[in-house]
Swiss-Prot record:
Sorted UniProt keywords: Ribonucleoprotein, Ribosomal protein
CC terms in the record's Gene Ontology section: ribonucleoprotein complex; ribosome
A Pfam family recorded for this sequence: Ribosomal_L34
Gene: rpmH
The keyword Ribosomal protein is assigned to this record: yes
Signal peptide region: none
Protein name as it appears in the record: Large ribosomal subunit protein bL34
Keyword Ribosomal protein: yes
GO terms for biological process, alphabetical: translation
Compositional bias annotation for Polar residues: 1-11
GO MF entry, a single one: structural constituent of ribosome
InterPro entries linked to this entry: Ribosomal_bL34, Ribosomal_bL34_CS
Biased composition (Basic residues): 12-24, 32-46
Lineage: Bacteria, Pseudomonadati, Pseudomonadota, Gammaproteobacteria, Lysobacterales
TM spans (from-to): none
Length: 46
């Protein structure tokens, strides 16, 4: 039996799990965004 690939892309899940609004919902998510801003990331979230 062959094992399936683990990455099954879905834009909906991508945004829901890693999007800007998902990050803003939690305190830790906001920490992630502030770290990425401090680092100078062009893209903050998915």
């Amino acid at each position: 039996m062959a094992t399936k690939r683990t990455f099954q892309p879905s834009n909906l899940k991508r945004k829901r799990d890693h999007g800007f609004r998902a990050r803003m919902k939690t305190a830790d998510g906001r920490k992630i965004l502030s770290r990425r801003r401090a680092k100078g990331r062009k893209v903050l979230s998915a």
